[in-house]
Amino acid sequence: MNANTIIAGALSVGLLAVSGPALAQTTTPEWRTVAPENLLVIDTAKGRILVELEPRMAPMSVERVRTLADQGFYDGLKFHRVLTDFMAQTGDPQGTGEGGSELPDIEGEFQFRRGRDLGFFNIATGQAGLLGFAGSMPVFTQPDAQMMVTADFKTAAQALFCPGVVGMARNQNPHSANSQFFIMTGINEGLNGLYAPFGRVLAGLDVVRTLKPGAEAANGQVDDPDMMTRARTAAALPERERPVVRVRPPSSPAFTAMVEQVRAERGTRFTVCDLQPIVEVTGG
């Protein structure tokens, strides 16, 4: 397998929020609980990272990561490539960026079809569509009106590579994702539409940012890197060891209040990447 290297590519969507609609206060649950099968628990010597997997947007990627994690494949694997304010890459048994699992490569899941049941919450209007959240993921999408003229009554959408978003690494072949993945610590719009986002860090982004970085001159390759000591879905852990994670829905009053606060602080520079999920973690 050729090196799985994450590089900037063609910009597919502008993240700058050129206008922002008033956020309506609707009747909505104050919290939602992340399903154990969609909670990836990554332990490191630096601390724990909790990732919500998003099978509605990248089902093959999520199934692959679940399978490998619960097999113990990721235990002891290195964060072999880490670039400050960009991303941390792991999941290679060789620790070089050249390796993968024995499972076949999967197709690139760079976009998905959004139906009304996804629960997209519009936050702003971008250059060519709507910007908002679905679950904990930042999303760019065509308006709902497009659903009326499509055969499946859905519209095109893609999750965005904001801080905390987790994506599948690949080589130059767009359908070469296997076991490696990367966790964003900064914003890189050039990845949008070119790599498959499949989840988001809900807790532990500060841990990711403390992982030992590599030099830019070495393309982020790390000498004596940090590693994942264990990675499992919460569903695969003994019940007494399972963390319980609750997230404020994007339409909740608490989240919408945060949006307006951040929008006021950032002004014309406001983007969906300025927003992080509001999370509560207990147990584990």
Give the ranges of each region predicted by the language model.
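Bacterial N-terminal signal peptides that target proteins for export
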Residues: 1-10
